[in-house]
């Protein structure tokens, strides 16, 4: 026991010695009172607070507490903390529990803080005061916040018993922490209480002070004392010239008459922390002044003005003789805050906000740099229209605020659903209590951008609805691009003329449309003083969200969702056509389809945004953001491909684009009846990409320091490597031809692995060197090295594989490029023979002197200098084969080139083999894509059609080969089918260039209406047309039912195929009729199939269905009308009534009638067999025979049949349906 008692004094003694050392070092020089023992006073002060709650744990000193200086807090305290000297552990626990169930309370530290409370950040001039508070000791100054400030505390030494310290955020290395002083500080030295005035202070009340302002002859030299209730307190306005705030005094609250006072003396700005609305004050020695640009005079404080609490016994109202000419009319009464609903203007478009006062707690931080918070879990709070930099650091969940004269805006739109409170410069935001919670760990995008958000409000003059949308859009953009594409501080930096903000540039197109620049700048004095009140928050219009910036992954997912939601087999195959298709044709029609989505298809409209990268794995361009990548097809403009590699790494923003979704479906529908059953879809996948013109996009370079090191998928294109910009060599070449991007085999170089090489994705180009090698000289290139054979065309074969595949989309024939090899010069670098990679024979045939493999670290640059302009002009045109060469049997050159518009794209059977064997997947069907194109030629009015086939290894086809697109094909292989039709196929040398995208809106162009005789004009006649004609006779009629699986004839609904039973016993009906028609100029044989047969026979759907049901039993009925009567062919016995019915029908006026026929030629324009010449035919006219040349009949395929306007409905059986 004795030893224990002896330890206590020694512990206290050690604590007292440490305290004395700390006080002498940290506080003594700062004390101005002479001959005072500072240490005992501080110790007594600490003891008083320590013992104030009756706590005595065996010692009168807080031995567990240690003194801390300002410098120690700033240097060593890296985590938020709080210290409560007079609290026990249970008291702290109760305090911490009030932080809320989801709150993270401030941890407690046992620290003693002393310092001088001041409004000077250092020993500076008085003019540097800006209304901020600081705690200062010998080691430094720390900013602080105090809720209930007494002006008599300034400049005195205090012990702070309850406080919290919040260090700067980790991302803010240049920032400083701050103190939050919870309770009133305890003075170390007794504060002198100033005695009241000996005589009452003569004061003016608001009514008299207001009238005095309007007297012309009594304005000069007037200094008066004003008294009244504080009815309004503006925000603290800080401009480049000065800082100030404006308060209004009235007789009562709310006041009928008020008078405004401007406080702009630096030493008096701290009054803003003292003033509380509803409290009565006296302001002494005020003078009258006039604000520049204002008509009225106002009261303004002087250097000697003081702020006092109004005590009725200490003041006396000053009686004045208010006579003289008035400068202006009586001011309007101070408007009271409105509690009514938002008012609307007569047009119903604009709304007017409500002014009110509100007290509440911050429950969430929505966007701290933008000044957006959540109040009481149901209101939004926007502080952006005030200068709230000092308030921002204390704003976190748990802070209680009092809002004076704040605007309430409801239904602002722009993606915001909750009502929003927003104070303008007239209102005030006052702290009522600090938060018990630790600051949240904000992501970088929630930490940067305060100056940019201020720029949106103060320079762009955005209204609140548009500002809320802009902040949300910037958050979306930061989430898309940061931090992997660029740093948050780069993206959200303040925009200046020499350094524009990347974030703001992305919003400018939308902001310029909704809020054009040039709006009047906010006038703070007018906003605070003018009646009626005008500010950016007073009047607003509900904003329909103009656009959004989805991530590329979200855009891709939305495109797939829309594509599969709209995938309807019954809509892709209309019922009249689908009901006659066998299973194989039915599923092949559904195997490929596509959907084009425009930005307007989304709500709100989508804006495409991403960094342009070139993929070395797929050889295509991609847009990339944080969520992933999306393939893209870009054209500089119509018929002009993308050819400048400098675009790699740039940020691309496009409001006009096409989101393409190609749907690949593997299905096994037995027949059209099961199209509504999704269970027959075995596999479905989609290819999603975007296509747009660069002319419709905004291209922004990304700051270089933000780009990460190159990866194989996104290599850098900057030729200035680690060796610096002064090392490297290059050579110009003219690109003559580019081959297809596909997997190729290359010879194994000597010394390589003995394993069998696998085909690699690659492509080759054929070009011509333009001059010799050039070396880097400064920022440019030196003169070309002389060549021994300058006059000879030096052709070169360049091979691209590996990472160099990324250049595929930028290389186009007719352009001049610079091939750049970084690093120290290497002799003969571009003259090395690469024959080990390719056989010499193809090079000799192409006339190439050498073959060169492009290395992974080499780069390409588009050359467009004036020196090579003649070369560009001479090679600008794309190669085109003549129509004669295309549609002829001349195979001197089987490679053809042409431009065409794609009419259709379908999947079909392979041209050569129907099956291919694949390891582990025997019997998998090969796919072949058929493009039907309309040739672009000036040689004929109606362009001929041609089929282009794409097979492995050119599958899947390149991006953009869609119906409606214009495409240039180079070096397709021309072939002739067994039916003498010309078609083309892809080969390894084929080059495809998309010239234009499918039109956004499809315009249905009616077929031309012609006479049949016009079809004999060869190339001048259309392939498809409409004519008005008359059915002369029926040549033949076939009605049959076939198995939907194997297409064999079905009798009584059963397949007649010999062999294994078909997996499905489903039959479909088919029909063919051949008609002879004439229109007075010529006659033609027309073949109609399936549902067109019903139209030709004039049968309604019910009659047609009944007729087909009669045919189901025999399975097949064939009628030939070669002469008089009808000859019957059938696979089973058919009753004579059916034969008689069909014969009667086909020879009746119901069929032999005038019609409007839409048709296409059975003979394709690509058929190279010469036309049948006119034949000599004998005619009998009475007893005299005649011989004449008769043209062969035209052969047409029916597209549709419509009844002629001149048809008589009496003889048409369909009229009864």
Swiss-Prot record:
Entry superkingdom: Eukaryota
Q: Could you tell me where this protein is found in the cell? A: Nucleus; Chromosome, Telomere
Q: Keyword DNA-binding: yes or no?
A: yes
Chain spans, region Disordered: 327-346
The protein's GO terms of the molecular function aspect are:
single-stranded DNA binding; telomeric DNA binding
| Any one biological process term the GO annotation gives | telomere maintenance via telomere lengthening
The keyword NAD belongs to this UniProt entry's keyword annotation: no
Q: Which GO terms describe its cellular component?
A: CST complex; nucleus
Pfam families xrefs: CTC1
Please provide the record's keywords in A-Z order.
Chromosome, DNA-binding, Nucleus, Telomere
Q: What does this protein do?
A: Component of the CST complex proposed to act as a specialized replication factor promoting DNA replication under conditions of replication stress or natural replication barriers such as the telomere duplex. The CST complex binds single-stranded DNA with high affinity in a sequence-independent manner, while isolated subunits bind DNA with low affinity by themselves. Initially the CST complex has been proposed to protect telomeres from DNA degradation. However, the CST complex has been shown to be involved in several aspects of telomere replication.
- Tell me, how does this one assemble? Component of the CST complex, composed of TEN1/C17orf106, CTC1/C17orf68 and STN1; in the complex interacts directly with STN1. Interacts with ACD and POT1.
Record's family? Belongs to the CTC1 family.
Q: What is this protein called?
A: CST complex subunit CTC1
Origin species, per record, is Pongo abelii
């Amino acid at each position: 026991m004795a030893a224990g008692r002896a330890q206590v004094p020694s512990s206290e003694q050690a604590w007292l010695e440490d305290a004395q050392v700390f006080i002498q070092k940290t506080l003594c020089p700062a004390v101005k009172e002479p001959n005072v023992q500072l240490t005992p006073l501080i110790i007594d002060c600490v003891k008083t607070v320590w013992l104030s709650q009756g706590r005595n744990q065996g010692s009168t000193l807080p031995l567990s507490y240690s003194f801390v200086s300002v410098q120690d807090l700033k240097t060593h305290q890296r985590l938020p903390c709080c210290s409560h000297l007079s609290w026990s552990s249970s008291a702290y626990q109760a305090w911490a529990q009030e932080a809320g169930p989801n709150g993270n309370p401030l941890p407690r530290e046992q620290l003693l803080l002393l310092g001088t409370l001041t409004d000077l950040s250092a020993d500076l001039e008085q003019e540097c005061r800006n209304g901020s508070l600081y705690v200062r000791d010998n080691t430094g100054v720390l900013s602080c916040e105090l809720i209930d400030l007494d002006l008599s505390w300034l400049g005195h030494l205090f012990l702070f018993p309850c406080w919290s310290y919040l260090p700067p955020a980790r991302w803010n290395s240049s920032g400083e922490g701050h103190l939050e002083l919870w309770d009133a500080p305890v003075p170390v030295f007794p504060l002198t209480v100033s005695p009241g005035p000996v005589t009452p202070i003569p004061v003016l009340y608001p009514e008299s002070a207001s009238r005095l302002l309007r007297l012309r002859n009594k304005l000069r030299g007037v200094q008066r004392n004003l008294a009244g209730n504080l009815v309004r307190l503006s925000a603290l306005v800080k401009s480049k010239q000065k800082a100030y705030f404006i308060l209004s005094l009235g007789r009562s609250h709310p006041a009928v008459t008020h008078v405004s006072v401007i406080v702009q003396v630096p030493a008096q700005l701290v009054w803003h922390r003292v003033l509380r609305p509803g409290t009565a004050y006296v302001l002494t020695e005020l003078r009258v002044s006039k604000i520049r640009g204002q008509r009225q005079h106002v009261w303004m404080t002087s250097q000697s003005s003081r702020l006092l609490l109004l005590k009725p016994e200490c003041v006396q109202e000053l009686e004045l003789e208010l006579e003289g000419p008035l400068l202006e009319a009586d001011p309007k009464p101070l408007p009271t805050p409105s509690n009514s609903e938002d008012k609307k203007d007569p047009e119903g478009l604009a709304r007017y906000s409500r002014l009110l006062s509100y007290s509440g707690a911050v429950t969430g931080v929505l966007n701290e740099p933008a000044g957006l918070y959540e109040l009481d879990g149901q209101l939004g709070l926007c502080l952006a229209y005030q200068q709230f930099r000092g308030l921002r650091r204390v704003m976190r969940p748990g802070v209680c605020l009092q809002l004076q004269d704040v605007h309430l805006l409801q239904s602002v739109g722009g993606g915001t659903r909750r009502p929003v409170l927003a104070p303008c410069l007239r209102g005030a935001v006052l702290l009522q209590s600090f938060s018990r919670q630790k600051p949240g760990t904000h992501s970088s995008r929630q930490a940067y951008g305060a100056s940019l958000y201020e720029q949106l409000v103060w320079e762009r003059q955005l209204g609140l609805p548009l500002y809320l949308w802009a902040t949300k859009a910037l958050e979306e953009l930061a989430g898309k691009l940061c931090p992997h594409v660029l740093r948050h501080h780069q993206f959200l930096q303040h925009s200046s003329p020499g350094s524009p903000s990347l974030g703001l540039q992305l919003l400018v197109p939308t902001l310029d449309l909704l809020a054009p620049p040039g709006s009047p700048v906010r006038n703070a004095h007018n906003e605070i003083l003018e009646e009626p009140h005008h500010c950016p928050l007073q009047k607003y219009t509900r904003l329909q969200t103009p656009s959004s910036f989805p991530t590329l992954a979200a855009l891709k997912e939305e495109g797939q969702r829309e594509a599969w939601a709209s995938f309807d087999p019954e809509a892709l195959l209309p019922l009249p056509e689908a009901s006659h298709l066998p299973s194989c044709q039915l599923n092949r029609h559904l195997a490929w389809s596509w959907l084009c989505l425009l930005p307007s298809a989304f709500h709100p409209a989508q804006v495409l945004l991403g960094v342009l990268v070139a993929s070395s794995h797929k050889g295509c361009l991609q847009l990339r953001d944080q969520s992933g990548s999306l393939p893209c097809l870009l054209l500089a403009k119509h018929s002009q491909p993308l050819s400048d590699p400098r675009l790699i790494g740039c940020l691309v923003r496009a409001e006009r684009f096409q989101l393409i979704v190609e749907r690949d479906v593997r299905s096994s529908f037995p027949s059209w009846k099961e199209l509504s059953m999704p269970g027959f879809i075995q596999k479905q996948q989609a290819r999603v990409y975007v296509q747009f013109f660069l002319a419709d996009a905004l291209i922004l370079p990304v700051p270089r320091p933000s780009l990460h090191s190159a990866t194989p998928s996104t290599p850098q294109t900057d030729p200035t490597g680690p060796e610096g910009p002064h090392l490297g060599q290059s050579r110009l070449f003219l690109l003559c031809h580019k081959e297809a991007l596909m997997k190729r085999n290359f010879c194994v170089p000597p010394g390589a692995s003995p394993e069998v090489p696998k085909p690699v994705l690659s492509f080759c180009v054929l070009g011509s060197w333009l001059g010799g090698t050039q070396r880097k000289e400064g920022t440019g290139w030196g003169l070309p090295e002389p060549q021994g054979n300058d006059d000879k065309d030096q052709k070169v074969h360049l091979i691209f594989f590996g990472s160099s595949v990324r250049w595929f989309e930028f290389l186009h024939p007719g352009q001049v490029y610079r091939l750049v090899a970084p690093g120290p010069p290497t002799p003969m670098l571009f003259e090395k023979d690469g024959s080990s990679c390719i056989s010499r024979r193809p090079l000799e045939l192409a006339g190439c002197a050498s073959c060169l493999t492009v290395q992974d670290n080499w780069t390409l640059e588009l050359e467009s200098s004036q020196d090579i302009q003649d070369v560009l002009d001479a090679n600008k045109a794309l190669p085109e084969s003549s129509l004669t060469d295309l549609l002829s049997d001349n195979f001197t050159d089987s490679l053809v080139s042409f431009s065409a518009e794609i009419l259709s794209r379908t999947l079909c059977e392979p041209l050569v083999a129907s099956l291919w064997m694949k390891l582990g997947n025997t019997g998998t069907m090969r796919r072949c894509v058929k493009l039907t194109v309309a040739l672009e030629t000036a040689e004929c009015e109606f362009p001929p059609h041609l089929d282009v086939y794409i097979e492995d290894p050119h599958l899947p086809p390149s991006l953009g080969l869609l119906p409606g697109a214009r495409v240039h094909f180079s070096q397709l292989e021309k072939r002739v089918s067994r039916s003498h039709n010309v078609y083309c196929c892809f080969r390894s040398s084929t080059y495809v260039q998309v010239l234009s995208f499918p039109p956004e809106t499809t315009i249905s162009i009616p077929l031309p209406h012609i006479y049949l005789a016009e079809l004999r004009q060869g190339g001048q006649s259309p392939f498809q047309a409409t004519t008005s004609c008359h059915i002369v006779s029926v040549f033949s009629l076939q009605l049959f039912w076939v198995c939907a699986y194997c297409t064999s004839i079905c009798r009584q609904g059963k397949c007649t195929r010999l062999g294994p039973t078909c997996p499905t016993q489903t039959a479909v009906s088919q029909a063919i009729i051949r008609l002879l028609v004439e229109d007075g100029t010529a006659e033609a044989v027309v073949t109609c199939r399936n549902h067109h047969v019903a139209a030709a026979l004039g049968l309604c759907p019910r009659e047609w269905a009944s007729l087909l049901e009669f045919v189901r039993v025999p399975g097949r009925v064939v009628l030939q009308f070669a002469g008089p009567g009808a000859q019957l062919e059938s696979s089973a016995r058919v009753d004579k009534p059916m034969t008689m019915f069909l014969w009667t029908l086909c020879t009746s006026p119901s069929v032999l009638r005038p019609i409007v026929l839409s048709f296409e030629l059975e003979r394709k324009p690509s058929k190279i067999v010469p036309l049948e010449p006119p034949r000599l035919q004998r005619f009998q006219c009475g007893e005299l025979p005649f011989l004449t040349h008769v043209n062969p009949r035209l052969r047409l395929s029916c597209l549709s049949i419509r009844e002629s306007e001149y048809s008589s409905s009496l003889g048409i059986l369909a009229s009864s349906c």
